[in-house]
């Protein structure tokens, strides 16, 4: 079947297949849209085209080695994926990162949020027809990716956080450059709003479109801007603070009507808050270590089955994660979640005491939000479906896993 193939199911309704290679689905998402006339009466999402078995693959990886798999969930926000996974393992192992590492992780988390929201704004605006914003947003996102490159040498799949801290420290001149860029970023966000927020066409395409009531948003499991756009105050950075968020002052933007326009405004306002958080992290960042003394080293080669001696490992001579079936991790299970750019990203890990996860389950916000598409699109036109999908900010890498 092609990108858009029409199947007649009765004299009054027809089914239009959208995707899995349609540019507006932002990935390999297929939607079977049933119409009566020009109005949507039902949508059936069809996922799985990007399934790579991340959760099963993690069972054959060591805890540090599974980091590269988390990079490739929401590949737009690899930094927050890494941090979410590290926090889960740290809580399981009882490791506390040093204060400087916490501030660094909070700072790069918010830079990732900015990068993610910029890409969302660019593609969402392009879907609706605002070409200029697409170009402007990519200009700023490129700056943020260049900062990531200066910090750790990678732009997209960074693998920068570590269990117990971060991989390398950030040089002072890089922190100064980031601080100056944040001042510029506030001006840029004002420019985006000048082009869109009061634009008559933008308002006509987004206001009153894809409305979801607060109680329905909660029942569907929406999180992040998709939930806060309906006026529900839920932000893990506030409710269950992690890293340095408890020491940072910021507000949580909320919508009122729960439509596409409110979800747009929430993300725009979040970008301003992220700028303020980054600046506070730089101002308050303490000196000191960036990695806990209890942090595990990366795995030995697979053929190695010996105990690591003192001096061989960053883990002070403890038995690191080798292929020997020895109890080197606490047995048990844990669920740990963070506020990723798209919503609640959670990791459920079961430990059997070995150096590898017995089971890892990822709670990806994009997968949950796809399930809300039928509810949001019911009664709307096909053009509105494009706007609604864009406002949910779906990435299929984490949805299919």
UniProtKB/Swiss-Prot annotation:
GO terms for molecular function: NAD binding; NADH:ubiquinone reductase (non-electrogenic) activity; quinone binding. NCBIfam families: NuoD, PRK06075.1. It is an enzyme of class 7 (translocase). It is found in: Cell inner membrane. The keyword Translocase applies. Its main location: membrane. GO terms for cellular component: plasma membrane. NDH-1 is composed of 14 different subunits. Subunits NuoB, C, D, E, F, and G constitute the peripheral sector of the complex. It holds the Pfam family Complex1_49kDa. It catalyses: a quinone + NADH + 5 H(+)(in) = a quinol + NAD(+) + 4 H(+)(out). Keywords: Cell inner membrane, Cell membrane, Membrane, NAD, Quinone, Translocase, Transport, Ubiquinone. It comes from the Bacteria. Its EC number is 7.1.1.-. It is a peripheral membrane protein. Belongs to the complex I 49 kDa subunit family. NDH-1 shuttles electrons from NADH, via FMN and iron-sulfur (Fe-S) centers, to quinones in the respiratory chain. The immediate electron acceptor for the enzyme in this species is believed to be ubiquinone. Couples the redox reaction to proton translocation (for every two electrons transferred, four hydrogen ions are translocated across the cytoplasmic membrane), and thus conserves the redox energy in a proton gradient. InterPro entries: NADH_Q_OxRdtase_suD, NADH_UbQ_OxRdtase_49kDa_CS, NDH1_su_D/H, NiFe-Hase_large. This is NADH-quinone oxidoreductase subunit D 2. The keyword Nucleus does not apply.
């Amino acid at each position: 079947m092609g990108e858009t193939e029409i199947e007649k199911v009765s004299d009054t309704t027809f089914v239009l297949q959208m995707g899995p290679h349609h540019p507006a689905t932002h990935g390999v998402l297929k939607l079977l849209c049933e119409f009566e006339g020009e109005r949507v009466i039902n949508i059936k999402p069809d996922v799985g085209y990007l399934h790579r078995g991340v959760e099963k693959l993690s069972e054959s990886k060591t805890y540090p080695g599974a980091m590269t798999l988390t990079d490739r969930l929401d590949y737009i926000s690899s930094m927050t994926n890494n941090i979410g996974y590290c926090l889960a393992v740290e809580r399981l192992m009882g490791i506390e990162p040093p204060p400087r590492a916490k501030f660094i992780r909070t700072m790069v988390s918010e830079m990732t949020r900015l990068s993610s929201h910029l890409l969302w704004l660019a593609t969402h605006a392009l879907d609706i027809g605002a070409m200029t914003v697409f170009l402007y947003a990519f200009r700023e996102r490129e700056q943020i990716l260049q900062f990531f490159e200066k910090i750790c040498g990678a732009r997209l799949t960074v693998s920068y956080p570590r269990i117990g801290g971060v991989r390398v420290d950030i040089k002072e001149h890089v922190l100064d450059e980031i601080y100056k860029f944040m001042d510029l970023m506030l001006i840029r966000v004002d420019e985006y709003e000048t082009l869109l927020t009061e634009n008559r066409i933008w308002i006509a395409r987004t206001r009153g479109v894809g409305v979801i009531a607060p109680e329905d948003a909660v029942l569907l499991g929406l999180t992040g801007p998709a939930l806060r756009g309906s006026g529900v105050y839920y932000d893990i950075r506030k409710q269950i603070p992690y890293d340095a968020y408890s020491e940072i002052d910021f507000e949580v933007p909320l919508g009122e009507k729960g439509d596409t326009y409110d979800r747009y405004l929430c993300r725009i306002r979040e970008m301003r808050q992220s700028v303020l958080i980054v600046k506070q992290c730089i101002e308050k960042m303490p000196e000191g270590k960036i990695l806990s003394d209890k942090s595990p080293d990366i795995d030995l080669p697979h053929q190695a089955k010996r105990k690591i001696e003192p001096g061989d490992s960053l883990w002070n001579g403890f038995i690191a994660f080798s292929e020997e079936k020895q109890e080197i991790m606490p047995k048990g299970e844990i669920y740990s979640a963070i506020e990723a750019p798209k919503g609640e990203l959670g990791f459920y890990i079961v430990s059997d005491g070995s150096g590898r996860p017995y089971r890892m389950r990822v709670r990806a916000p994009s997968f949950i939000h796809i399930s809300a598409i039928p509810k949001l699109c019911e009664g709307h036109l096909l053009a509105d479906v494009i706007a609604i999908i864009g406002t949910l900010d779906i990435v299929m890498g984490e949805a299919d896993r």
